[in-house]
């Protein structure tokens, strides 16, 4: 068999193994190792696996995942998350799906700190879903909105995949960050419209409560004043360059623990429980990333991406249709492989084609990011869905049903970006003249 045949078989085997209930990270690693070994050698396969495991677990950028998950777990076990959602309920509880909207807003802010889809999904699956359960929200809505809102971790700057894209294509990181602001906010806004419309049509998904008085709302703000200060310090420190994302997460986790101790909402047993749950979640996410890196190396040696690129360039199609084909490839890749791993794999292959077609690389960065983000929440694999499922133990069917409406809003933003490229290009051109 040639490399391409092995690669195609590998894709089908991955889906089959995954559907048996095998953990996704291990499934990708196993298929990637076997396929790589068949094409190169078993010795090379072991070497590749060892290198990828080392690279992922020694990469400083990934340390942001455990510290922010820990901050979320302490906030949840210490009752801080409960007070935050109680306050949000005072302001938004009378609106259909109000807490789900608050989750989208929180994920937008959180994504601006972490720049990670998996970290955002893991944190809000631990914190937001139990609170929405408490207020009688359907798991269809709560798990769906968390899995979909995880995409905001990649769209809102600073985004790690955007940094990688900028390095590969030699584009300005600052311009890429500016270009992502409006698309990211549009996605968040459309998510909120989806929630409102969906819950208005089916109130049982996100039942609205009684309208709270302004006195009750102000009183609830006093309960979260400490959390607000922590948020301002963490966000402000990040934006001013005082903290790296990991340092910001560490400061936040420590401050949240101190606040929980001070209010006597948590004890040492609760801290150890938070540490244990954070360790399990962080390891699960890092194993997913490691598995996708191993599988990505296997796909690279099959030459499937290069052959696909050559085939696309030979097609007698209009450049817009060729771009749509490239977008579909990114969408498919994002459904199988971690968004960052697929960016590293595919961008060096396709961006020269985009240059030849005459597209702006800053705009293309936004276009491919949105398509990859659709990929991380669609079957057959959907990394974000898997993260939420692993934490909540909810069925895949329920989560997939929940993310479907949000897929439509992501697709709409892609179409708008295609028709109106200034959505991405206005800020970079206006602020960096």
What are these regions (language model features)?
Residues 1-433:
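Alpha-helical transmembrane segments of multi-pass membrane transport proteins
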């Amino acid at each position: 068999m040639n490399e391409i045949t092995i690669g195609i078989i590998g894709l089908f085997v991955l889906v089959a193994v995954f559907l048996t209930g095998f953990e996704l990270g291990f499934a990708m690693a196993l298929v990637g190792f076997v396929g790589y070994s068949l094409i190169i050698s078993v010795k090379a396969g072991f070497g590749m696996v060892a290198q990828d495991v080392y690279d992922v677990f020694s990469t400083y950028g990934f340390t942001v995942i455990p510290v922010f998950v820990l901050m979320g777990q302490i906030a949840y076990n210490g009752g801080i998350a409960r007070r935050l959602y109680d306050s949000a309920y005072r302001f938004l509880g009378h609106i259909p799906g109000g807490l789900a909207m608050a989750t989208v807003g929180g994920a937008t802010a959180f994504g601006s700190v972490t720049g990670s889809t998996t970290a955002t999904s893991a944190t809000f699956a631990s914190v937001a879903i139990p609170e929405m359960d408490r207020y009688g929200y359907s798991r269809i809505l709560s798990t769906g909105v968390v899995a979909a809102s995880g995409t905001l971790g990649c769209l809102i700057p600073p985004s790690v995949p955007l940094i990688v894209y900028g390095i590969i294509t030699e584009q300005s990181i600052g311009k890429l960050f500016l270009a992502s602001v409006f698309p990211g906010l549009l996605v968040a806004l459309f998510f909120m419209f989806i929630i409102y419309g969906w819950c208005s049509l089916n109130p049982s998904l996100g039942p609205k409560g009684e309208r709270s008085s302004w006195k009750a709302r102000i009183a609830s703000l006093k309960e979260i004043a400490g959390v607000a200060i922590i948020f301002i310090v963490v966000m402000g420190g990040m934006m001013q360059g005082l903290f790296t994302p990991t340092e910001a997460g560490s400061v936040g986790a420590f401050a949240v623990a101190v606040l929980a101790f001070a209010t006597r909402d948590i004890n040492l047993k609760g801290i150890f429980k938070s540490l244990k749950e954070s360790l399990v979640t962080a390891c699960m996410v890092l194993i997913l990333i490691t598995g996708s890196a191993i599988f990505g190396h296997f796909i690279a040696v099959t030459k499937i991406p290069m052959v696909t690129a050559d085939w696309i360039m030979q097609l007698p199609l209009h450049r817009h249709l060729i771009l749509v084909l490239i977008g579909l490839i990114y969408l498919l890749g994002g459904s199988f492989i971690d968004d960052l791993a697929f960016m590293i794999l595919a961008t060096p292959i396709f961006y020269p084609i985009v240059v030849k077609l005459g597209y702006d690389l800053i705009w293309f960065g936004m276009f491919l990011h949105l398509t990859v983000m659709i990929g991380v929440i669609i079957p057959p694999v959907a990394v974000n869905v898997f993260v939420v499922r692993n934490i909540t133990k909810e069925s895949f069917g329920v989560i997939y049903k929940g993310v479907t409406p949000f897929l439509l809003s992501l697709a709409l933003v892609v179409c708008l970006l295609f028709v109106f490229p200034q959505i991405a290009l206005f800020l970079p051109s206006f602020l960096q003249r």
